[in-house]
Regions:
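Gly/Ala-rich phosphate-binding loop of Rossmann-like dinucleotide-binding domains
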Residues: 24, 28, 166
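Glycine-rich FAD pyrophosphate-binding loop
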Residues: 28-50
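Short, flexible hinge/linker loops that cap or flank conserved catalytic cores
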Residues: 4-6, 31, 86
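Dinucleotide-binding Rossmann-like beta1-alpha1 core, especially the glycine-rich loop
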Residues: 54-136, 142-143
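Short, hydrophobic alpha-helix immediately C-terminal to the catalytic nucleophile
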Residues: 21-25, 161
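Short beta-strand/turn micro-motifs composed of small residues
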Residues: 15, 41, 95
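Helical element adjacent to the flavin cofactor pocket in flavoenzyme catalytic cores
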Residues: 146-173
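Beta1/beta-strand and adjacent pyrophosphate-binding region of the FAD-binding site
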Residues: 4-19, 38
Length: 173
Protein backbone atom coordinates (compact mmCIF):
# COMPACT_ATOMS: atom_id res chain seq x y z
CA UNK A 1 0.00 0.00 0.00
CA UNK A 2 1.43 3.36 -1.01
CA UNK A 3 0.94 6.07 1.57
CA UNK A 4 1.26 9.75 0.89
CA UNK A 5 4.16 11.37 2.66
CA UNK A 6 3.76 14.52 4.69
CA UNK A 7 5.27 17.67 3.21
CA UNK A 8 7.23 18.28 6.40
CA UNK A 9 8.33 16.42 9.52
CA UNK A 10 10.45 17.23 12.54
CA UNK A 11 12.29 13.90 12.33
CA UNK A 12 12.82 11.60 9.34
CA UNK A 13 14.24 8.15 10.05
CA UNK A 14 15.59 6.06 7.20
CA UNK A 15 14.94 2.37 7.74
CA UNK A 16 12.21 0.41 9.52
CA UNK A 17 14.47 -2.18 11.13
CA UNK A 18 15.42 -2.51 14.78
CA UNK A 19 17.42 0.72 14.90
CA UNK A 20 14.90 2.82 12.98
CA UNK A 21 11.81 1.63 14.85
CA UNK A 22 13.54 1.72 18.24
CA UNK A 23 14.63 5.29 17.53
CA UNK A 24 11.08 6.21 16.49
CA UNK A 25 9.71 4.58 19.64
CA UNK A 26 12.09 6.55 21.90
CA UNK A 27 11.55 9.83 20.01
CA UNK A 28 7.77 9.40 20.27
CA UNK A 29 8.17 10.28 23.96
CA UNK A 30 9.20 13.78 22.84
CA UNK A 31 7.30 14.25 19.58
CA UNK A 32 3.62 13.63 20.23
CA UNK A 33 1.82 14.94 17.15
CA UNK A 34 0.96 12.78 14.14
CA UNK A 35 3.41 13.23 11.29
CA UNK A 36 6.21 14.74 13.38
CA UNK A 37 8.19 11.52 13.00
CA UNK A 38 8.40 9.83 9.61
CA UNK A 39 9.97 6.40 9.16
CA UNK A 40 10.87 5.57 5.57
CA UNK A 41 11.29 1.89 4.71
CA UNK A 42 11.79 0.73 1.13
CA UNK A 43 10.33 -2.74 1.58
CA UNK A 44 8.78 -4.01 4.84
CA UNK A 45 9.53 -4.00 8.53
CA UNK A 46 12.31 -6.49 9.33
CA UNK A 47 12.83 -7.26 5.62
CA UNK A 48 16.56 -6.48 5.74
CA UNK A 49 19.39 -7.20 8.14
CA UNK A 50 17.22 -6.72 11.25
CA UNK A 51 14.96 -9.58 10.25
CA UNK A 52 17.94 -11.86 9.73
CA UNK A 53 20.54 -10.90 12.31
CA UNK A 54 18.91 -9.03 15.18
CA UNK A 55 17.22 -11.85 17.04
CA UNK A 56 20.19 -12.60 19.29
CA UNK A 57 20.30 -10.28 22.29
CA UNK A 58 23.79 -10.24 23.77
CA UNK A 59 26.55 -8.00 25.04
CA UNK A 60 29.49 -9.65 23.33
CA UNK A 61 31.27 -6.78 21.59
CA UNK A 62 34.89 -5.64 21.45
CA UNK A 63 34.18 -1.90 21.54
CA UNK A 64 33.59 -0.60 25.10
CA UNK A 65 31.02 1.99 23.98
CA UNK A 66 29.01 -0.69 22.19
CA UNK A 67 29.18 -2.91 25.26
CA UNK A 68 27.63 -0.18 27.45
CA UNK A 69 24.93 0.48 24.86
CA UNK A 70 24.10 -3.23 24.63
CA UNK A 71 23.97 -3.61 28.41
CA UNK A 72 21.30 -0.90 28.36
CA UNK A 73 19.55 -2.56 25.41
CA UNK A 74 19.44 -5.92 27.19
CA UNK A 75 17.72 -4.20 30.14
CA UNK A 76 15.09 -2.82 27.73
CA UNK A 77 14.42 -6.31 26.32
CA UNK A 78 14.18 -7.66 29.88
CA UNK A 79 11.71 -4.95 30.90
CA UNK A 80 8.84 -6.64 29.02
CA UNK A 81 9.82 -10.06 27.64
CA UNK A 82 6.27 -10.95 26.66
CA UNK A 83 5.67 -7.83 24.60
CA UNK A 84 9.09 -8.03 22.97
CA UNK A 85 8.84 -11.78 22.27
CA UNK A 86 12.11 -12.05 24.19
CA UNK A 87 13.45 -15.31 25.61
CA UNK A 88 16.06 -14.63 28.34
CA UNK A 89 18.15 -17.79 28.04
CA UNK A 90 21.65 -16.28 28.30
CA UNK A 91 24.42 -16.41 25.73
CA UNK A 92 27.48 -18.63 25.38
CA UNK A 93 30.64 -17.79 23.47
CA UNK A 94 32.62 -21.00 23.17
CA UNK A 95 36.12 -20.40 21.85
CA UNK A 96 39.42 -22.04 20.90
CA UNK A 97 42.76 -20.83 22.26
CA UNK A 98 43.32 -18.37 19.41
CA UNK A 99 40.42 -16.26 20.77
CA UNK A 100 41.30 -16.54 24.47
CA UNK A 101 42.87 -13.11 24.92
CA UNK A 102 40.02 -11.26 23.16
CA UNK A 103 37.29 -13.13 25.05
CA UNK A 104 39.08 -12.54 28.37
CA UNK A 105 39.12 -8.83 27.54
CA UNK A 106 35.38 -8.84 26.84
CA UNK A 107 34.76 -10.57 30.17
CA UNK A 108 36.84 -7.99 32.08
CA UNK A 109 34.98 -5.14 30.42
CA UNK A 110 31.61 -6.75 31.19
CA UNK A 111 32.60 -7.08 34.85
CA UNK A 112 33.70 -3.42 34.91
CA UNK A 113 30.18 -2.28 33.94
CA UNK A 114 28.42 -4.77 36.22
CA UNK A 115 27.17 -7.05 33.44
CA UNK A 116 26.68 -10.55 34.84
CA UNK A 117 28.79 -13.15 33.09
CA UNK A 118 31.11 -16.03 33.90
CA UNK A 119 34.46 -16.86 32.28
CA UNK A 120 35.69 -20.44 32.20
CA UNK A 121 39.29 -21.14 31.17
CA UNK A 122 41.17 -24.31 30.28
CA UNK A 123 40.13 -27.20 28.08
CA UNK A 124 39.23 -29.56 30.95
CA UNK A 125 37.21 -26.94 32.87
CA UNK A 126 35.43 -25.91 29.67
CA UNK A 127 34.51 -29.53 28.89
CA UNK A 128 33.17 -30.03 32.42
CA UNK A 129 31.23 -26.77 32.30
CA UNK A 130 29.58 -27.62 28.99
CA UNK A 131 28.76 -31.17 30.13
CA UNK A 132 27.03 -29.58 33.11
CA UNK A 133 24.72 -27.84 30.63
CA UNK A 134 24.57 -30.49 27.88
CA UNK A 135 25.40 -33.93 29.24
CA UNK A 136 26.22 -35.22 25.74
CA UNK A 137 28.66 -32.37 24.94
CA UNK A 138 31.59 -33.61 22.81
CA UNK A 139 33.33 -30.63 21.14
CA UNK A 140 37.11 -30.65 21.51
CA UNK A 141 39.63 -27.80 21.53
CA UNK A 142 37.51 -25.39 23.57
CA UNK A 143 39.76 -23.42 25.94
CA UNK A 144 37.49 -20.57 27.03
CA UNK A 145 33.79 -19.98 27.55
CA UNK A 146 32.15 -16.64 28.17
CA UNK A 147 28.71 -17.32 29.63
CA UNK A 148 26.54 -14.22 29.69
CA UNK A 149 23.82 -14.84 32.25
CA UNK A 150 21.67 -12.14 30.66
CA UNK A 151 20.80 -11.98 27.01
CA UNK A 152 18.90 -14.44 24.90
CA UNK A 153 16.91 -14.28 21.71
CA UNK A 154 13.80 -12.59 20.36
CA UNK A 155 11.33 -13.53 17.67
CA UNK A 156 12.47 -10.38 15.92
CA UNK A 157 10.16 -10.25 12.90
CA UNK A 158 7.09 -10.63 15.11
CA UNK A 159 8.48 -8.13 17.60
CA UNK A 160 9.30 -5.50 14.97
CA UNK A 161 5.89 -5.78 13.34
CA UNK A 162 4.29 -5.37 16.78
CA UNK A 163 6.54 -2.38 17.53
CA UNK A 164 5.55 -0.79 14.21
CA UNK A 165 1.86 -1.38 14.98
CA UNK A 166 2.14 0.11 18.48
CA UNK A 167 4.03 3.27 17.52
CA UNK A 168 2.08 6.51 17.82
CA UNK A 169 0.67 7.86 14.54
CA UNK A 170 3.47 8.35 12.04
CA UNK A 171 4.24 7.27 8.52
CA UNK A 172 5.97 3.93 8.18
CA UNK A 173 6.72 3.03 4.57
Amino acid sequence: MIMSLPTKAKVVIIGGGIHGLSTAWKLSETYKNPGEIVVLEKKDTAAGASGIACGVVRNNYFQPAMRELMAHSVSVWESDPKAFKYNPVGYLQISPEVMHEDVASIYKQQKAIGYESEFIEGEKDCMNYMKGIFDDWQAQGITSILHEKKGGYALIKIQLKRLKKNLPPMVVR
